[in-house]
Design a protein with these regions (language model features):
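Subset of outer-membrane beta-barrel
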Residues: 1-171
Length: 171
């Protein structure tokens, strides 16, 4: 969809509290632009926790934009506040199967599911789906030393294909 552009840049930090629990937080700078209108910017944050039930199962919870910030000073449009609860099942350390419930305060409850297959120590392929709005994703991850690069294409009927890029560094 050529008339809309949405950007997010974040910096986050995660901490392992014990062998079975980790927490994380991220600060995000958001910008969206609709053709013919002003660009809107916002700063928000997100927090999450991950519980390792056993070697194969993990359960996580995440809150995005708990402060309910708005895009800019001159708009009533709020950045979505989203709650997520999910689980991951790992088989043979190469295949992850995930499921997640997502509740945006302004939209319907959504279900996500995905698979992540580690081909080797460098390359991972991923695919997933979201129930609302109905969409699918396909991507690859490249791991090099402490860096991870993710290239993803998401498809949704109204907006078409949305390319996404992620870069992570692990200290």
């Amino acid at each position: 969809y050529d008339l809309f552009n949405d950007k997010k840049i974040g910096i986050g930090y995660g901490l392992k509290l014990a062998d079975f629990v980790s927490i994380g937080a991220q600060i995000d700078l958001l910008n969206n632009k609709v053709s013919g209108y002003e660009s809107n910017t916002a700063v928000t944050f997100e927090i999450g926790t991950l519980f390792k039930i056993n070697k194969k199962i993990q359960i996580g919870a995440h809150i995005y934009n708990p402060a309910r910030v708005r895009y800019g000073k001159n708009t009533e449009e709020r950045v979505p506040t989203v709650f997520r609860l999910g689980a991951t099942y790992t088989t043979k350390e190469k295949l992850w199967v995930t499921a997640e419930l997502e509740q945006d305060l302004d939209n319907n409850l959504a279900f996500r599911a995905g698979i992540d297959y580690k081909i080797n120590s460098i390359l991972t392929v991923r695919s997933g789906m979201l129930s609302y709005p109905l969409s699918g994703t396909l991507g690859v991850g490249i791991n090099y030393k402490s860096m991870q690069f993710d290239i993803i294409g998401a498809y949704q009927k109204i907006t078409g294909i949305s390319p996404q890029l992620g870069i992570s560094y692990e200290f």
